[in-house]
Amino acid sequence: MDISVYVASAFSKNNKGGNKAGVVLNEPTLTTTQKMAIAKQLGYAETAFLTESNCADFKLEYFTPKEEVALCGHATIGTFAILMHLNKIHKSRYTIETNSGVLTITIKEDTIFMEQNQPTFYDTIPANKLTGCFDLNLLNTNYPIQIVSTGLKDILIPVKSEADLYALEPNFEEVKKVSKHYEVVGMHLYTFNVDRIICRNFAPLYDINEEAATGTSNGALACYLYKNHYLRKENYVFEQGYSLHSPSEIFVNLVISNKDEIEKVYVGGKGYYCEMQELSLK
């Protein structure tokens, strides 16, 4: 059985870089095992499978080479970039059924925004619990290390400077152990000033040592920065992927209520069609 798979890059910067994902359109008969096999053959962090939905415009399922995950920001942006490439987008608002619920996609010109879940703030973690993961002297102790989710749980870890962020060498086996212990997808490391927020993301538990652009992690980080009054904006731009030579830009827009609470979280980015691959399934 041959399957056509699109490859898209999401969260690209100036039509370059970004994070690649596989996109499979309208193959409703594929089994979970086959979807996993496709994701593994492609070898990208995630592959999205789009089918019809009874409760939304589309149904999207996401597979890493190892297992199914509830949600994936860059694979969603990538899917809609492919639909735009195929001239199948005819309105500015769509709904998608995912294992994280029904979410809204908004398209503004060439930028695709994806609604996230409202933020959930979990435990803060003492730095010594990360011993062995990387050099703890590079961490910025002015800000708490915390687990936050807008769909997927990540440990948000502040680093002193951009130079320190790139100098940091993770021990992926230790990162994997800590991620498993705290039941998170991975670790999202960041440094920021008034003008820039720069990140790196490690998810070796899901066979992704480092990822060039992560939508859900930056959605969580925007909420963390806003709620704690560290950097208050309604529109954030996160930069990621430089250490992988794949510069990426992730936009996060927060909708804030009159009571100064985060009502909605939208993660957005640009994307482009890369190629099409034909895979053989046994």
Where are these regions (language model features)?
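Active-site proximal loop and beta-alpha junction motif in alpha/beta enzyme cores
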Residues: 1-71, 77-282
